[in-house]
A protein has these predicted regions:
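N-terminal, Lys/Arg-enriched amphipathic/low-complexity engagement segments
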Residues: 35, 39-40
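An N-terminal domain-cap segment
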Residues: 44-51
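Short hydrophobic/aromatic beta-strand or adjacent loop that forms the aromatic wall/cage
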Residues: 49, 132-137, 186, 264-268
């Protein structure tokens, strides 16, 4: 595993202030990452210690997130250096410090997940991460069909949803998924069995540009198609994005059947043991930034 570079003289790492997080969101928007409008606020509320600022004196020049989801599972999320400070090694130093900070926040032998850009995979390998699979971002214009058997999520569904999310994410993140699905503007729908067990879940949220899906979890491709199609009908004509695990061929076919096109590929990687999850039931990941 590669050694952690030292920060140049005058640069420091510190917890982020609220105004820093707003600045991070603005930089992310400029880069075209199109975060959900409430994404960072939710993450801040669930794990306020996850946000790390890189400063030159008192000036914010970069930042990132390191989420402690459970003692045995963390996630390295948003990571950005201000455009005019790139190319001098700050990103390399910040990335390693984030990794080390998260390792310190977790139990020995814990797993850390991340989604990274493809041309940085060798760098992440040097940092101890190993590729699990690729994810594909699809985008297009929403066009779907109302399904009378697709119903709005209710409080009684949450126990099933927490269990489903934990099984398909690789860790129990009940507080996060509860907050995520209750955020302003989120529309979350389910299909239930006759015994009222949740068979499929899909959520869509307002982003800086249009809407983003996530998560989309289902026991079968047909159930996934129905919940996705229903939500698309609710935002008809709007720009939409959905991030699909590439090994899930049914998920890719589903996105393409609604006229969405692949525009971006990233690498899901893990440090430590790789979780045993069945991505064939994941038709849309929650977020590249938060897992």
């Amino acid at each position: 595993m590669s050694r952690t570079p030292r920060l140049p003289i005058g640069y420091t790492l510190a917890p982020m202030r609220d105004e820093d997080i707003n600045q991070l969101a603005e930089w992310a928007a400029i880069e075209g990452w199109n975060p959900g409008r409430s994404d960072l606020a939710i993450a801040r509320r669930i794990d306020p210690n996850a946000f790390i600022a890189l400063r030159d004196g008192d000036q914010l020049v970069g930042g990132g997130t390191v989420f402690r989801i459970t003692p045995s599972f963390g996630f390295m999320g948003l990571f950005i250096i201000r455009a005019d400070r790139r190319g001098v090694g700050l990103g390399r130093a910040l990335w390693h410090h984030r990794r080390d900070r998260l390792i310190d926040r977790l139990a020995p032998g814990a797993t850390i997940g991340m989604d990274g850009v493809l041309d940085m995979v060798p760098f992440y390998n040097d940092g101890g991460f190993r590729l699990a699979h690729h994810d594909l971002r699809y985008q297009g214009v929403a066009s779907g069909e109302h399904d009378p058997y697709v119903l709005a999520l209710i409080d009684e569904d949450r126990t099933d949803i927490r269990r489903l999310d934990a099984a398909l994410f690789g860790a129990d993140r009940s507080a996060f998924i509860d907050a995520w699905l209750s955020a302003p503007g989120v529309q979350a729908v389910v299909i239930r069995s006759e015994s009222q067990r949740v068979l499929a879940l899909a959520a869509i949220r307002p982003a800086l540009d249009g809407y983003k899906f996530g998560p989309v979890l289902a026991e079968s491709p047909d159930l996934a198609r129905r919940v996705v199609g229903h939500l698309l009908s609710m935002v008809e004509g709007q720009a939409v994005q959905i991030d699909v695990p590439e090994p899930n061929a049914s998920g890719r076919a589903l996105a393409e059947s609604f006229g969405l096109s692949p525009v971006f590929r990233c690498a899901r990687m893990y440090y430590g043991p790789t979780p045993k999850v069945n991505v064939q039931h994941v038709f849309g990941v929650t977020s590249f930034e938060f897992g």
